[in-house]
């Protein structure tokens, strides 16, 4: 019995956030145009604490170097293993679904069942 309690109380090591999964699944969402909203990179490449690299004119994707810089920035807004505590997922999530009250770029997801939200949550949980 004590062993089970010990295991339950033992701190869990958070999953490692994977760069390749970020580049394949997360970064495209930051570049995607959504109806009624600007692409994340439009606002987040200037004047915000969550600062992404500007996308070079005429480019549809980032270089590996720029992706690594973005990955390092995005990790600051994520609590690995805890999507429900990660600002990357909470800021653009509707308040009624557990998101923050305000996101200057609007609310991108109405529920946690949104496929984009699930993609991000999977990555935060260590998905590859």
What are these regions (language model features)?
Residues 1-7:
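Sec-dependent signal peptide recognition
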Residues 9-128:
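Aromatic- and Gly/Pro-enriched helix-to-coil junctions and flexible linker segments
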